[in-house]
Every structure is written in C-alpha cells, then in structure tokens.
From Swiss-Prot:
Name recorded for this polypeptide: Isoleucine--tRNA ligase
Cell compartment(s), UniProt: Cytoplasm
The keyword Membrane belongs to this UniProt entry's keyword annotation: no
Xref: HAMAP family: Ile_tRNA_synth_type1
Biological process terms in GO annotation: isoleucyl-tRNA aminoacylation
Functional summary from the UniProt entry: Catalyzes the attachment of isoleucine to tRNA(Ile). As IleRS can inadvertently accommodate and process structurally similar amino acids such as valine, to avoid such errors it has two additional distinct tRNA(Ile)-dependent editing activities. One activity is designated as 'pretransfer' editing and involves the hydrolysis of activated Val-AMP. The other activity is designated 'posttransfer' editing and involves deacylation of mischarged Val-tRNA(Ile).
Organism for this UniProt entry: Prochlorococcus marinus (strain MIT 9515)
Binding-site residues for Zn(2+), renumbered to this chain: C936, C939, C956, C959
The record's free-text note on cofactor binding: Binds 1 zinc ion per subunit.
Length: 965
C-alpha cells in the first residue's frame, strides 16, 4: 500500500465567488414556535384551510368527527386521532373532493357535573337546583371547548372552528329528541323494571360502554348451606329405590343445598336457587353426617375447599330437583329450587346458583319465568333498604358483605369464605365498583332491530378487518340498551307520567312539540318550565294530570345521534358519512351507538367505512399516567418544556410526523427518544428541501421548458423515480397506510436524493457555467422535485410544505401549496428500463463508495475526488449497464466517474499493482488508486492537463473556460 500523500499546497486565492452557491430564505432551522403560527395565519387570511376544501368541485367527502369529551387538557390520544383525520382531509382536499370537516364535542354527562359540584362550597351545592347546575355545566363545557379548540388549531388541524357541533346546542338536542322519538314510535324504546348496571358512587344507571374492568379485583366469595325443608316427590322416589328415604326425612335438619356467591350482600334478596337440568347432581354425606346437594363434577373441588370427605348417597339429573324447598338463610320464609340455564356450569362454585331476581340479569330472567318477586334490596346510594330487613342501612360496597357473612356464620350456614379474583365492572368515571340493581328504566330494545344492525355491519368496510368481527360479536351478544340516567346534566327523556296512575304520555304529538321547543329554546326549559308550558296545546287543559320525567339520556345516545344532528342537517356533509375514525374502544362506544340509532331509525348504517387506531403508550409500552410520571404532553412537544435542553420545542409538524410514522392499527409508543429520531428525519427532509430551493434561486421554468428526451439519463431517471415515489405515496394515502408514506419519504429524501442524485448534482450546480445546459437541466429537474415534494408531504408536514412553497424563488400560479392539487405527472416521464439499468449502476456505486470510505477511514485520502477507480467486472448485467451508459449517456452529465464523484473511472481487463485498496465482491473487483495529475483549485478534480489560474492556482480546462467566459 502506498504511503500517505502530501496534501497539495493551498493557494491563498479562492474561486468561491465564481461558483453558483446555494441561496434561499428557507431556513435550515424550522423555528416552528414562531413560523408555524405565521403559516396558519397565512392560511386563515387567504381562506386556504376550510374554504379551500369546501369550494372544491368534486364529490363530497365526509369524515364525521367523533366528539371528544369537553373536559380536561388535550393528550396524545387526541393528537393521534385528530392528526390522522386531518391528514386524510388534507389529502382529499388536494385530490379535489369537497371536504368540510365539522369538529364536535360531547358536552353532557357525569364528569362535567362532578367538576361543577367539586368547584362549589358545601352550602353552594346544597342551594344548587338542577337548572343552576345545568347553567354552570354549560359554562364549564364551553371553557373546556375553547381551550381544546385552540390546541387543535395549533396542531394545524383544519375544520369549521367557527361552527363546530356541540351536543349542548339547541339544534343538536332537538335532533336527538327526534331520534329518540322515531325509535319510540318504531317500537324500539320501552320502560321497564330490569336489573341494570348501577353506580352507587354516581347514583345512576350505566350502559355497558360506561364500564371498565380492572385487572386486580377481588370479591368476598362464600359457600353457604341452605337447610332443605321439603323434598320433591321425584327425589323421594329416587331415595326409596336406594332405601334412603327414611334416613333423609328423619334428618331434614342435616340436609342442605350448597351454594356459592361472590355477592354476599344479595343473599337477603334470595328468592330461589337455580340448577342446570343437564348437569348431574349428588346428595353426598360428610363425616359429620351432614348431607349436601351439589354438582357431581365438583365433589373433589368442594371436598378440598371445605376440608371434608364426602360419600355419595344418590346421583340425580338436575331436572329432577325442581320443587325441593329450603329455608331462606336470613328471612322467615321458604323458597324452591328452580331450573336455570346454561349460565350454570361446573367451572366453579357448586353448580347451584343463588338467585336474587332484582340483582342480576340471569336471575331476573329466571324470576320472570317462575313469577318470583323482582325485589330490589338496595337504594340509589348502595344502602340496603327495608326489603333486606335486619340488614337495612348497610352499604353494599362497605359493611354489608362482612356483616351478612358474620350473620351466616352465627347461624352455622357459612361453609367457607375466601377472596376471589375475577372480572368485575367499575364505573369508568368514578373508578368505583358497580352493582346490578333492578329499577324502572328506559331501554332500547336491540332485539327488535338486531338482524338489521348485523346486516348493516356487513355493508360497512372495516379497517382493520378485525373490527368487523369485533363489533359483530358485540351486537350479536348485547342485551337491551339502558338509555336512562338519573342525572341533571343531559338531554331529558321527553316523557310525562300520570300523577295518580301508571299511564305515560309520550306520542308523536308530544315528541314533535318538545323537539320544536328545544330547537328554539334549548333543553334547559325542561327544568325551567312547568308541564302546562311544555305540553302541546291539546293537552294543556289537563296538564295537572301529568308530571314530567327527570331522567336524562345516556351520553352514548347523545353522541350516537350525531349522524342525525350533524350529517343529516348540514348541507355540506353527507349521510351516511364516508368515514368514521376513532380508537378501537369505540366498537363498544360511539361506533355501536351510532350504528344502533341509525339502523333503528333509517335501517342503514351511518357510515360507509370505519377506521380504528390504537392507544398512545410510553416508550416502554406502558399506559400513560401521572402516577408513573410517563405522560407525554403534546403541548410540550410543540412548544417545549421549562428546560428546553431536555424538552426542546419540536413544533406541530414533528408531532404530525410521529402520527404518520406509526402503525396506528395497534397501540403506539411515544417518548423523548422517539421524538429525537423523528426530529432527525424531519431535519433531513427539511435540509433536502432547502438544498433544492437554494439551487434554483436563479431559475425560471417559463424560460426553461425542456423536453424529457433532451435530458441526460440521470435526469430522466430522476423524473421517472419521482413518478414512482408519487404513485407509491398516493397509494399509501388512499389506503390510509401513512407509515408507508413515512418510509417512502425517508428513503426518497435520503437514499434517492441526498445520497445519490443531489450528491452527484453538486458539480453540475456549483461548478458549471451559470446558464449552461448542464446546470439548467439539473435545475429543471430540481424544480419539479421540490414542487411535487411539497405537495406530497403537505397532508402530513403541512407547515413545512407551505414554507417550501412560499420560498419557491419563481412565481407559481398557486399562492399556497394546497391550491396546487395532487400531482399528476406526465406519462412521458415513466421509463421502466431506466429503473433496472440504474438500479444496477447504483449497486456498483454503493460497493465502490464502501471501498473509498475504507481509504478515508485509514486517512489515505480526504475527498473521493483524490481517487481513480478501476473496475474489473465479474457480473455481465453490471458490465452491460456500464456499456449502455457510456453509449447513450450525456457526455457532460452521465460519465460514471461523475456519478461516483471520483476523478476517473475505468473498466479494465487487468488490475494495476499500484493501488490504495482493493475490494473483491460478487459484482467484480474494485481497485482504488490515487488520482493522477494535478488538482483543479476550482472544481477539485484531478486532471493530467491543467493551466495556470489566478495567483499561481491551477485550473482544469473546463474551469478555465468558464472563468474566461
């Protein structure tokens, strides 16, 4: 290997002023904190955002916004959701669709009501009536909406911010009454006594969508013995066959039914015990002579738990047990064994289920079947009432379980008490356990339109496809929807009850009248006006007969009516909407409530396509929480934290880039390391754009229209590659696969542009004569790249795209990048043959660059131009591609030495011995030599023939001619 060469003696004179150096006002730094708001102001002033999409002449595209709750600060979940929607809307706008995005807010419900109450002193709460609470809740919600709205706008989200939809607005509440009314008149809404999920902490009924199931819930479970007081005739015959009849009848005080329950507080409400007719049961005697009835398959488990040995006396089918009578465990009454259903299994317990019809849906159904009393033993606070007799006043979530268990123990009925871990429903707002409680509630009878809802699901496109299976199974299995709530902050159920009878007043006349009143005055009048003012004219004379109901509707009924209150009512929108896009939890929430109401009223789904995303997690895949200290605040991402070194201001575009980078169909991570990586990608894209802009500062496309056939091969390939990238990004946007856009963009800017085309172009741009064809053809291509790159990134990097557009140095027909429309590149640019040829040459270039980098690492050379490359081909495809380039390439641009940025490239039959480094791979042998000749002080190429320049400098002939001219 040759020793390190002495560096050329540097001249004091610099040819810098003779070079065509980069010139642009497009800053290398984004300065997002100040620049992004300026761009947003530009959009607003020039009516670029909302009005641009609304004025398009194409068909409507309606992405209907699922309303976030009007409470609390914006978080990363909001960012993921709203940015995804905005990317789609901006893309559709550029494609010419008529896009009018109406953002919305869900304004009613318990969290806001609780916030209002918590802000008041105790005497203020005491004096606050329902109307006063509603006015304070309205004020609170509007403040929250204003704060969230400003945050969304700062993220670059376009929408009808001056006219969003709010579920507290008059027209919305009126439309919701219309949906309720049509469902009632269609026979899908009824009032009935049923066990519902009841939240003692909120004092209201809850729907399934308002529940959550913590992982670490333990209940106090008990095994209880119920003393049999009478045996059925069928069992007596069976006993007689085994000669056991007299033994059991003479020892009834030792004959028991074994039950198991995880809700001991419901035992005072017991009205029966239920068995599965298909299960085999046994009467089994323990070592003390006590005889128990339980499922045969559970003998071993029960024996182990109770620490007793059992001897089976008789084995009977469950269907034979009906009619057996037992003494109630806490009351002076007798009950019977009844037949239950398949919910009774031998997976746990005893195979015999304690049945309290007022406190469980299965129990309720059994109670209805056998005409058992539907007794609710708990009040709205969770306190046991008079029906619980001696336990009245105990609270089911506090002391009731322990004291009832103690009573069972005292009466020798407690067999075992143990902690039992299982799924148990909690109120998602208060984070407290719920109970089943039978109350008079309003229900939507899903059974009445279930088949239509399932058909509607089939008609919708679900992304991902698993979403269809998920919502289908939920609708198949769901019971009737409890839509009434015992709270003040909501839309009232517009019903009047007879004061002295059981009749209700709810018909088309009252519904239409209330709907008109709410549209004019708002729902507050339900609490402000008396019955005479609320009733239609024909009922006013008998207004004293009626009293208005005070239940409000489930907030899921509120948001689930948005298709009627927004999409149907606003001319600029479409119903069904083209797209609903929310988190995957909305299969049981908004997607489902919207589907059920729309199908019940109009027999069709409210959406054509449903797209779901996962949740935002921290970098370690954990749920964000203040207690863990892992919350990522989108506001801090944009504006930076108190310590800007630790929490720099990245701007809205980096936040948006994060959304485009992730596979949002699953849960997605976010954190400081991820943000740093995204910031690097953002910077690379920005620097690429800056390089493009800076090198076309003296270019005007009007003067320089060039035919594709006149371009060098490298430029033709670059335009062909631009078409490929544009097509790939278009497909990614069309399929909502934004992570593919992110990957394509990154590869295009780094691999295709920075590392290849723009790297090669430096000599053409800086060194060539200013107006030479060699330079102008490159500028022509770069102008096409930068214009189309700006459009392609604009749905995601909207601020950067606009910044690029505003810094294009020549005049364009469009004042904004969003007025350009989506790229429709000339078909003449497409040349598949170039792709294959140049792909081969790029592979060779990569290998040669590795060899040159080896020289640089060993400090043998500084720049690649100090080298000469010999290549001995061993790959015919590469050899043919080099021959093709030499034959058809432009002699000023398509020299392979220029593509390598070396002083000379030779295809050889033999290698020289005098080399710096040699590399042998599947493409052939690559030899790196020290370049011969002298270095040109202007272009830094090494040439055999140089001339004297200024102040003893050396110039190659090319540079000498440029300087002279």
């Amino acid at each position: 290997m040759k020793p390190k060469n002495n560096k050329d003696k540097k001249s004091k004179f610099s040819y810098k002023e003779t070079l065509n150096l980069l010139k642009t006002d497009f800053s290398m730094r984004a300065n997002s904190v100040s620049r992004e708001p300026q761009i947003q102001e530009f959009w607003l002033k020039n009516k670029i955002d909302l009005e641009l999409g609304s004025s398009n002449l194409g068909e409507k595209f309606t992405l209907h916004d699922g309303p976030p709750y009007a409470n609390g600060s914006l978080h990363m979940g909001h960012a993921l959701n709203k940015v995804l929607k905005d990317i789609i809307n901006k893309y559709k706008t550029l494609k010419g669709f008529k896009v009018h995005f109406v953002p919305g807010w869900d304004c009613h419900g318990l969290p806001i009501e609780l916030k209002v109450l918590q802000s008041l002193k105790s005497h203020e709460r005491k004096d606050l009536d329902s109307l006063g609470l509603r006015k304070k809740a309205t004020d609170y919600a509007k403040i929250q909406i204003k704060n969230q709205l400003e945050g969304f706008k700062r993220w670059g989200i376009w929408g009808d911010w001056d006219n969003p939809y709010l579920t507290l607005k008059n027209n919305y509440e009126s439309a919701q009454i219309g949906v309720f009314g049509k469902m009632f008149l269609n026979g899908y809404i009824y009032r009935g006594l049923k066990p519902v999920h009841w939240s003692p902490s909120s004092r209201t009924a809850l729907a399934e969508a308002e529940l959550e199931y913590p992982e670490e819930h333990y209940s106090s479970s008990v095994y209880v013995s119920l003393n049999i007081s009478n045996l059925s005739d069928e069992i007596l015959l069976k006993l007689e066959e085994k000669d056991l009849k007299n033994k059991l009848l003479s020892n009834l005080n030792k004959l028991f039914i074994a039950i198991w329950t995880t809700t001991p507080w419901t035992i005072p409400g017991n009205e029966a015990v239920a068995i599965n007719p298909r299960i085999n049961y046994v009467f089994a005697e323990d070592q003390n002579g006590d005889i128990f009835l339980f499922a045969k398959d559970l003998i071993s488990e029960i024996s182990e738990k109770l620490e007793r040995e059992f001897n089976t006396l008789i084995d009977v089918k469950g269907s034979m047990l009906t009619g057996i009578e037992y003494k109630h465990p806490t009351k002076n009454k007798f009950c019977n064994i009844v037949i239950g259903g398949d919910y009774i299994t031998t997976e746990s317990g005893t195979g015999i289920v304690h049945t309290a019809p007022g406190h469980g849906m299965d129990d309720f159904n059994v109670g209805k079947k056998y005409h058992l009393p539907i007794t609710c033993i708990v009040d709205e606070k969770g306190n046991l009432n008079n029906h619980a007799e001696k336990f009245c006043g105990l609270n089911v979530l506090k002391d009731a379980n322990d004291l009832i268990i103690e009573d069972l123990k005292k009466n020798n009925l407690l067999l075992l008490k143990e902690k039992y871990k299982h799924r148990y429903p909690y109120d998602w707002r208060t984070k407290k356990p719920t109970i089943f409680r039978a109350t008079e509630q309003w229900f939507a009878s899903v059974e009445g339109f279930r088949s239509s809802a399932l058909k509607a699901i089939e008609d919708v496109e679900w992304m991902p496809k698993t979403g269809k299976k998920r919502i289908y199974s939920m609708v198949v299995g769901r019971g009737d929807w409890c839509i009434s709530r015992q709270r003040s902050w909501g839309v009232p159920i517009p019903v009047f009850y007879e004061k002295k009878g059981k009749e209700i007043l709810l018909n088309s006349e009252t519904i239409n009248h209330i709907q008109k009143l709410f549209n004019e005055h708002g729902a507050d009048i339900w609490w402000d006006w008396d019955e005479k003012d609320l009733l239609p004219k024909q009922y006013k004379e008998e207004s004293d007969r009626w009293i208005k109901g005070l239940d409000t509707m489930d907030v899921w009924f509120d948001s689930g009516s948005s298709w009627a209150a927004v999409c149907e009512q606003r001319e600029e929108l479409a119903y069904p909407a083209d797209l609903y896009l929310e988190g995957s939890d909305q299969h049981r929430g908004w997607f489902q409530s919207s589907l059920l109401t729309s199908v019940a009223v109009n027999n069709k789904p409210p959406y054509k396509k449903v797209l779901t995303h996962g949740f935002a997690l921290d970098e370690n895949g954990r749920k964000m929480s203040k207690s863990l200290g892992n919350v990522v605040d989108p506001n801090i991402i944009i504006n930076g934290g108190s310590n800007q070194k630790i929490q720099p201001a990245y701007g809205a575009d980096v936040l948006r880039l994060w959304v485009s980078s992730v596979d949002y169909s699953v849960d997605v991570p976010i954190g400081s390391n991820i943000l740093k990586q995204l910031s690097d990608v953002y910077r690379k894209v920005r620097n690429t754009a800056r390089y493009l802009l800076g090198n076309i500062h003296d270019y005007d496309p009007i003067d320089e229209e060039i035919d594709i056939d006149q371009l060098p091969i490298l430029d033709q390939w670059m335009l062909n590659r631009l078409v490929d990238v544009s097509d790939q990004i278009t497909i990614a946007y069309e399929n909502y696969e934004f992570s593919k856009f992110f990957q394509i963009l990154q590869s295009f800017c780094v691999v295709d542009l920075s590392n290849f085309y723009l790297d090669i172009a430096k000599d053409r741009l800086y060194v060539s004569a200013k107006s030479s064809i060699r330079r102008r053809t490159c500028q022509f291509v770069m102008s096409k790249i930068v214009e189309n790159l700006a459009v392609l990134i604009s749905p995601v990097l909207c601020h950067m795209a606009e910044d690029i557009w505003q810094n294009i140095p020549y005049s364009t027909n469009e004042k904004s990048v969003f007025e350009r429309g989506w790229p429709n590149l000339p078909k003449s640019w497409i040349n598949p043959e170039l792709n294959e040829r140049i792909s081969n040459l790029r592979k060779l270039r990569v290998e040669i660059n590795k060899a040159i980098e080896g020289c640089r690492t060993q400090q043998i050379i500084g720049a690649a131009l100090e080298t000469e490359v010999n290549y001995l081909p061993e790959n015919e495809i590469i050899k043919n591609s080099l021959s093709w380039l030499e034959k058809f390439g432009n002699k000023e641009v398509d020299l392979y030495s220029d593509w390598l940025i070396v002083s000379k490239f030779n295809v050889v039959n033999n290698l020289f011995e005098d080399y710096l480094i040699i590399d042998d791979n599947e493409l052939g042998k690559i030899q790196i030599l020290k370049a011969k000749g002298q270095k040109c002080d202007r272009c830094w190429h090494y040439q055999s023939n140089t001339v004297m320049g200024i102040e003893d400098t050396k110039l190659c002939k090319r540079c000498a001619n440029i300087i002279t001219s």
